[in-house]
Amino acid sequence: MRIARFSDGTNPVYGALEEGSTRIVGLKGDPLFSPVEPSGQIYELDEVRLLSPVIPRSKVVGIGNNYSDTPIPVDERPEPPIFLKANTSVIGPDDPIAIPAWSNDVVFEGELAIVIKSLAKNVSASDAPQVILGYTVANDVTARDAMTGGPWSRGKSFDTACPLGPWITVDPQLDVTNLAIRSYLNGEKAQDSS
């Protein structure tokens, strides 16, 4: 199932994209915190504005240095840097990114984002699947010159630095260890990784 958050010109709503279709079935409720059910409303994908599929209630937690050209066994990997993105950095997939005037080195990187379905803390690795709602795409926009000699959040947390979406893929059988991530800049492929 693919869950979208969108607006048809009124208040934002959640919906489920019908498989193999451009129709969205409206949902009542918030899939991140409560069970949902069909609202009876049907929307066409090309008639709505897609919003960020997630409204962060707290923060976006990022893990740095998560790509490698050489596979490294999990137990041999160094502790990765952790950084935060403010909830004001989150925007929808088609919203404009406001490049900060104070930076001369802004870059982007496509990322796989894990969507947590409820507030969670101190979750063990074995219990992690129980708190995962699904996955979406994130654009990790970074002002690299603001990170020099300081915390990563300085360069990663400015307003609009975290486009998400277009939807949350909910599939417990999804093998996230074997997904392709491609990013494009002005129609040209800029990233192709997994």
Question: Where are each of the predicted segments found?
Answer:
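Active-site microenvironments in enzyme catalytic cores
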Residues: M1-N11, A16-S193
